[in-house]
Amino acid sequence: MVPESFLLELPKCEHHLHLEGTLEPDLLFPLAKRNNIQLPDHFPQTPEELAVRYTQFKDLQDFLDYYYIGTNVLLKEEDFFDLAWAYFTKVSKQGLVHAELFYDPQSHTTRGVSLETVTRGFERACKKAHEELGITSKLIMCLLRHLPPQDCLQTIEEAEQLIKSGVIHGLGLDSAEKPFPPSLFVECYERAAKINPELRLTAHAGEEGTHQFVSDALDLLNVTRIDHGVNSKQSEELMARLAEQQTLLTVCPLSNVKLQVVQSVKEIPLQLFLDKNIAFSLNSDDPAYFGGYILDNYYQVNKDFPDWDFKVWERIAKNGINGSWCEQKRKEELLAKVDAVVAKYTN
């Protein structure tokens, strides 16, 4: 094991974080009040009760049911700004230096909140985080795969200007995985890439779905990153391909345990991925719901993989930087920061 002080100081990049998934109970209830939103009768009545319910998810769908109720309290640009700013202030104390952030506009547009409102609120928080906290960030618009692909295509058309201008830096695919394979979204990804050939592409795959979902995301959607991807372990051929192409897997340890993908963090094939030279980063996914932000994930992995030394953690940090979608100059700055922290602890 390495000292937790080292992990705290180690510069971190987060690539798998849903902004709506950072909605803590102590922000959810004030926003509901501010916007006169009536929460469902079966919904817990206090932040404390809700926090307890968040410890009891049976699977991905059980979590999603609560996640989508939570999004109902977000209505105005200010709400989205407050949500993202609360995330940035938390992680600024955890060694986070760069974040690539998912958001789900369809959770909001289906309620009559415009895509522009959502995006501008988040974008303002990203700018403030850069100016005041020194954290760089990119926004990744996700399509909800449980909605009809035609609706997803419509969302891409609505986002055309934001994609063209680069405010939306990447496209992702999330929500319930198993019933909705990548093949349903080929047209969506092709259209988005046509609007802006520089748009970065990723997709959730291989969390509850098999390794075939990962291969299909690579082959059919032309993604250059895989979100989760833990079931890639099922195929030697796929693992060799991921290693050769240095495709980043954005792994979410505490999330995988919370949603019963694995029983413990030890079961996540992180050592296998290291042995196979597959690049991965460690991320928090939906931290308000899963009881852990990025540093909590680093601490838990450190406990469950006690043989990992400074060299291994240096490699993970650098893989995260090299796999990021920030500019080369920023990558070089961050790599130098990692070197400085490693040198401090190993010299």
From Swiss-Prot:
The record marks H228 as: Important for catalytic activity. The active site is at E207. Its cofactor is Zn(2+). Substrate binds at D286. Binds 1 zinc ion per subunit. SUPFAM superfamilies: Metallo-dependent hydrolases. Signal peptide: none annotated. One of its GO terms (molecular function) is adenine deaminase activity. GO terms for biological process: adenine catabolic process; hypoxanthine salvage; IMP salvage. CDD domains: ADA (cd01320). Its main location: cytoplasm. It catalyses: adenine + H2O + H(+) = hypoxanthine + NH4(+). Belongs to the metallo-dependent hydrolases superfamily. Adenosine and AMP deaminases family. Adenine deaminase type 2 subfamily. NCBIfam families: aden_deam (TIGR01430). This is Adenine deaminase. The lineage of its organism: Eukaryota, Fungi, Dikarya, Ascomycota, Saccharomycotina.
